[in-house]
From Swiss-Prot:
Source organism, top-level taxon: Bacteria
Keyword Transcription assigned: yes
One Gene Ontology term from the biological process aspect of the record: DNA-templated transcription
Recorded GO CC terms: cytoplasm; DNA-directed RNA polymerase complex
Protein family per UniProt: Belongs to the RNA polymerase alpha chain family.
Organism of origin: Anaplasma phagocytophilum (strain HZ)
GO molecular function, one term: DNA binding
Stated name of the protein: DNA-directed RNA polymerase subunit alpha
Name of the encoding gene: rpoA
């Protein structure tokens, strides 16, 4: 059964190309089996646009305003305009999932998101956002309610929650707003042909991702991939490594492990930097290495995306990959087993 996935080509290279804006990035993934670029690209795009958690304004509170159609003295815009403007406010909360921000300003002049009172608990990502325009000597103060969530939540839900007492820290003048939580603004796919040796019937997937700045584009892709992995795991009714071991035993005979798992990483043709990173992280055998995730590896000092691509390519050549589960690892007498495999 393991041949169903072991015989497929896995991506050996993931290149990250930064754009002119820090919130825009292109990822180039290759090689992929024919048709897989569209399959994986669409799945990643849908998850990124719908299921990643972010932060959004879900309500405001202004003294003297009881509903969206209230006209404010000395303010050019009415409350409905303020609500519309604040729906585009992008904030990142650092130490909590819910917070009340305060905006204080005095006219005359334009009021932007830069007037939101600074705090160590949040970061305003678009401080140049226009909020309202004040007349001369007009004092303006507003509470802005921000929380975390996913997708889109209409104002009616928060309005109902505030009336029933289900929304915490909400005052009597609370005005609910529509909340759009997705930190990903745009995902574009481009698919080209890729080559392995003389064969050109492989896919290259290019993902252009734009976020609001609360999450890096490459992290958004990684989180989306993890969500898909977790959701699809429920469909797997067998042990991946056990099936791989059975396949190896069938082909090679008696030994209980894929011989590659018992090889030492020193045998791999890696750069000096990659070798040193593995050594410093006490990774001795390939069996140790494959159980690490990409996130684990990227947290290793001096280990970057280039080293990660190099290791992915080497493992793919052995039909292995990072993030595998190897039960009962390490085996007893691993040194003897390793020698036995090397002798075979």
């Amino acid at each position: 059964m393991a041949d169903h996935w072991n015989k497929l080509t896995r991506p050996s290279s993931i290149k990250v190309v930064g754009g002119k804006e820090p919130c825009v990035m292109e990822l180039v993934i290759e090689p992929l089996e024919s048709g897989f670029a569209l399959t994986l690209g669409n799945a990643l795009r849908r998850v990124m646009m719908s299921s990643l958690r972010g932060f959004a304004v879900y309500g405001i509170e202004i003294e003297g305003a009881s509903h969206e159609l209230t006209a404010l003295s000395g303010v050019r815009e009415d409350v409905a305009d303020l609500v519309l403007n604040l729906s585009m406010l992008r904030v990142k909360l650092l130490n909590s999932n819910q917070r009340v921000l305060r905006l204080v300003a005095r006219g005359p002049g334009e009021v932007t998101a830069a007037s939101i009172v600074d705090s160590a608990d949040h970061v305003v990502l678009n401080k140049d956002l226009h909020i309202c325009t004040l007349g001369k000597d007009v004092d303006f103060c507003m509470k802005i309610y921000v929380n975390s969530g996913k997708g889109y939540v209409p104002a009616t839900e928060y309005r109902a929650a505030s009336r029933s007492g289900g929304a915490s820290e909400v005052g009597s003048g609370f005005i609910a707003t529509n909340a759009l939580y997705s930190p990903v603004k745009k995902v574009a796919l481009k698919i080209e042909s890729s080559r392995i040796g003389q064969f050109t019937d492989y896919d290259r997937l290019m993902l252009t991702v734009e976020t609001d700045g609360s999450v890096a584009p490459d992290d958004a892709v990684a989180v989306a991939a993890k969500i898909l992995q977790d959701q699809l795991q429920s469909f797997i009714s067998f042990d991946e490594v056990e099936e791989t071991r059975k396949s190896v035993d069938k082909e090679e005979g008696v030994l209980p492990y894929d011989h590659n798992l018992l090889r030492k990483v020193d045998e791999l043709e890696l750069s000096v930097r990659s070798h040193n990173c593995l050594k410093n992280d006490n990774i001795t055998y390939i069996g140790d290495l494959v159980q690490r995730t990409e996130s684990d590896m990227l947290r290793t000092p001096n280990f970057g995306r280039k080293s990660l691509n190099e290791i992915n390519e080497v493992l793919a050549s052995m039909n292995l990959h990072l993030g595998m589960k190897v039960p009962n690892w390490p085996p007893e007498s691993i040194e003897n087993l390793s020698k036995q495999y090397s002798e075979d």
